[in-house]
Amino acid sequence: MTNILSPEKSENDQELPIRPSYLQEFVGQQQIKENLLVFIKAAKSRNEHLDHTLFYGPPGLGKTTLAKIVSNEIGVNFKSTSGPAILKAADLAAILTNLEKNDVLFIDEIHRLNTSVEEVLYPAMEDFELDIIIGEGPAARSVKINLPHFTLIGATTRLGLLSNPLRDRFGIPMRLNFYNNDELKKVLNRASKLLDIDLTESGSEEIAKRSRGTPRIALRLLRRIRDFAVVDSKSVVDKEIADFGLNRLEVDHIGLDSNDYRYLKFIAANYNGGPVGIETIAAALSEQRDALEETIEPYLIQIGLLQRTPRGRVITIAAFEHLKMPVPNKSHNQFNIFNDNE
């Protein structure tokens, strides 16, 4: 699923010029920043590596940026890879043996590591040792390699998919939450200065409230609205040009787009608001289940338009009102069955 409001990183997202390098430049996630600063200062004062750290939460909130910031704050090398890129234990061994003391190794999508790779990672995280099997069959032997102390930073949007042994080895687990409008405005104002965009307060407010609580989306929308401003010979991005551009991009006043409307209308029109299973929804919309669960559903749940229940997905009365559709003749409890994940 690819669209302007996807929180997933796109090849067109040019974030490096505006990505903050230190904690004082990073906007939002205040408690995480304060705690990280304490942990980093303590580790530096002891001349030790920072404990292994896990950043988890919805995509687009700054997990990769924070990982890079940690290495900058400590003053060490930053090595980056991803779960899908580490196909076998030898790939991980090659990365680990090239680390230096206190370096930061960042593994994005760490929940996608396969079991054989995880088994190599456990002793590396706990004992800073690497067990390598040399040879095959009866002649095979195990060789132990000592590793420098390093910090592993993992990032995941699917905490529940991490195995318990791996999750338990992270001494610093941190959940990143959606941003509020004021925080998004600060992100936009900082980016506008770095990108030389004349962004007004009203323009910043308009973009922020339609950005689904996600900085990556806010920055993407800012760039696209700048394009509309340039073509229309506007020198300033104000509320008027922001509203015009966002409407052209089919982003409504609360940050929903055509994919969200398809999702909500399917449940409303075909299942009287639900409950309906996620596999049924995915098949009907020709989308992958993971795409729905990671891209569409988190924000709909966040703003109170959707509930995940043991019996399936249920859209709320507020969703019917937003769709301007009549509310089915159900009791109020049927719209609030349970608040557990399916």
Swiss-Prot record:
Keyword terms: ATP-binding, Cytoplasm, DNA damage, DNA recombination, DNA repair, DNA-binding, Hydrolase, Nucleotide-binding
Enzyme Commission number(s) of this protein: 3.6.4.-
Residue numbers binding DNA: 289, 308, 313
Region of interest (Large ATPase domain (RuvB-L)), residue spans: 1-179
Protein's GO biological process: DNA recombination; DNA repair
Region Small ATPAse domain (RuvB-S), residue ranges: 180-250
Catalyses which reaction(s): ATP + H2O = ADP + phosphate + H(+)
Gene3D superfamilies for this protein: 1.10.8.60, P-loop containing nucleotide triphosphate hydrolases, Winged helix-like DNA-binding domain superfamily/Winged helix DNA-binding domain
Location in the cell: Cytoplasm
Predominant place of localization: cytoplasm
Listed GO CC annotations: cytoplasm; Holliday junction resolvase complex
List of residues binding ATP: 18-19, 60, 63-65, 126-128, 169, 179, 216
Molecular function terms, GO-annotated: ATP binding; ATP hydrolysis activity; four-way junction DNA binding; four-way junction helicase activity
Disulfide bonds: none
Region annotation Head domain (RuvB-H): where it falls in the sequence: 253-342
Record-linked SUPFAM superfamilies: P-loop containing nucleoside triphosphate hydrolases, Winged helix' DNA-binding domain
Residues given in the record as Mg(2+) binding sites: 64
PANTHER family named in the record: HOLLIDAY JUNCTION BRANCH MIGRATION COMPLEX SUBUNIT RUVB, PTHR42848
Domain topic, free-text comment: Has 3 domains, the large (RuvB-L) and small ATPase (RuvB-S) domains and the C-terminal head (RuvB-H) domain. The head domain binds DNA, while the ATPase domains jointly bind ATP, ADP or are empty depending on the state of the subunit in the translocation cycle. During a single DNA translocation step the structure of each domain remains the same, but their relative positions change.
Assembly and interaction partners: Homohexamer. Forms an RuvA(8)-RuvB(12)-Holliday junction (HJ) complex. HJ DNA is sandwiched between 2 RuvA tetramers; dsDNA enters through RuvA and exits via RuvB. An RuvB hexamer assembles on each DNA strand where it exits the tetramer. Each RuvB hexamer is contacted by two RuvA subunits (via domain III) on 2 adjacent RuvB subunits; this complex drives branch migration. In the full resolvosome a probable DNA-RuvA(4)-RuvB(12)-RuvC(2) complex forms which resolves the HJ.
Family: Belongs to the RuvB family.
Protein role: The RuvA-RuvB-RuvC complex processes Holliday junction (HJ) DNA during genetic recombination and DNA repair, while the RuvA-RuvB complex plays an important role in the rescue of blocked DNA replication forks via replication fork reversal (RFR). RuvA specifically binds to HJ cruciform DNA, conferring on it an open structure. The RuvB hexamer acts as an ATP-dependent pump, pulling dsDNA into and through the RuvAB complex. RuvB forms 2 homohexamers on either side of HJ DNA bound by 1 or 2 RuvA tetramers; 4 subunits per hexamer contact DNA at a time.
Protein name as it appears in the record: Holliday junction branch migration complex subunit RuvB
